[in-house]
Amino acid sequence: MKHITIIGAGLAGTLCGLYLARRGYEVELFESRPDIRNSPTDYGRSINLALSCRGITALKAMNLLSEVNKIMVPMRARAIHEANGEIHYQPFGRHIDEYINAISRSDLNALLLNKAKLCPNIKLHFNMKLHSLDIHNKKIKFENKNGDFVEASYHRLIGADGAPSHVRDMLKNEGIVSASRDFLSHGYKELSISKKHTKGMAREHLHLWPRDSFMLLGNPNPDDSITGSLFLANEGKDSFAELNNEEKLHLFFKTQFPDAYAAMPNLVQEFFGNPTGHLSTIQCSPWYYKDECLLIGDAAHGIIPFFGQGMNSAFEDCRILDELLDEYQDDWSRVNSVFYEHRKVNTDAIAKMSMDNYHEIHSDIRNPKFILQKQIERELMLRYPEHYVSMHVLVMFTNTPYAKAMAIGELQSGLLEQICFPITDIKELNWQEVEKLLSLYDKKLAKII
């Protein structure tokens, strides 16, 4: 029987359903929320996401990229806004054609759902909240929007219901998986930066206003407005709890983000009206039960958003699952275990790299030593493209396994420390000495590759 039930019709669940439908499976998608195509809100979730190589590869394999291209905006570099008004620029890639893309979560989800609706072997069900799961008898019970319960049987189940996954929690309650969700002490809130006031802000850039313990991030939209995300402690000094009235809010933004503040006419309404989102990392082991149930995406390995890889790693799940189904001729008893073994080490790696990037964006990004290392790293990639490709480039612009990219990054960190140790300016570099260090680096790199 080729029937699959997917819990969650967000980005990962819907793309996974499209992949499986292409293989001839009868797919049913159940979503707890209303159909996002008919809703004016995004349920308080992150509005803009970063689409890079891994996600693009997965979409391209389903012939979806040409349509997705129409709703995304290139981000070619970071624009770092200092409190004193200075702006510094840091390119993401090695050249102008290497960039990440800002895309609306709701627009992309709607596009995928429209594709699913056109697929004769996909059925979509909305307002169906998972109430219980009988994993041993393959029974599921949903609560619909009227409060009525609907029971169903399944042949094979995929949990793609995000970081707060009910499927994962129910597997945990049965003792089938071990799982935890670790929250950061910071949360985030979506705020808009008006297109009428963004003329002084570079287009096609990811805008960052990093401060000591908090940060404002801005993703560009197709209409030239910017979607801002304020990352702030939940409690204590400079926190969401502290900014509890309009006077404090205005003073905080005017002092910390003066150029953004001037472009935020709806700041008060949005700050006090929009929900505060949570930031968390999911640890889960294993991700499957026999050949009958599998977790993917954030439900299995949710991460904090500071490397822009949450959606990309979830889409990569879909692509790799499809490739394994090819390799093992749809033998799910083998596919589930191999998928977990292959992906777990890599998603653990991107979870760690995302946490490291969180610290980098918050504080390191303005450190003179860090800036020097980035300058040298970029020069290494330009001078020695066959020898040196940075960890960030490997993560964002290639499909190199995350674990390998992280191992290479650790090696590069040591190399950059050696190169930078005696200098304070890139002009002081002795490139003959650098080439000697690079030769040693190549030998160590060969063991990883």
From Swiss-Prot:
InterPro entries linked: FAD-bd (IPR002938), FAD/NAD-bd_sf (IPR036188), Kynurenine_monooxygenase (IPR027545)
A biological process from GO: anthranilate metabolic process
Catalytic reaction(s) noted: L-kynurenine + NADPH + O2 + H(+) = 3-hydroxy-L-kynurenine + NADP(+) + H2O
Spans through the membrane: none
Pfam family, one: FAD_binding_3
Keywords in alphabetical order: FAD, Flavoprotein, Monooxygenase, NADP, Oxidoreductase, Pyridine nucleotide biosynthesis
Cofactor annotation: FAD
Gene Ontology molecular-function annotations: FAD binding; kynurenine 3-monooxygenase activity
Enzyme class: oxidoreductase
Pathway: Cofactor biosynthesis; NAD(+) biosynthesis; quinolinate from L-kynurenine: step 1/3
Catalytic activity, EC: 1.14.13.9
Family of this protein: Belongs to the aromatic-ring hydroxylase family. KMO subfamily.
Protein task: Catalyzes the hydroxylation of L-kynurenine (L-Kyn) to form 3-hydroxy-L-kynurenine (L-3OHKyn). Required for synthesis of quinolinic acid.
PANTHER family attached to this UniProt entry: KYNURENINE 3-MONOOXYGENASE
UniProt name for this protein: Kynurenine 3-monooxygenase
Gene: kmo
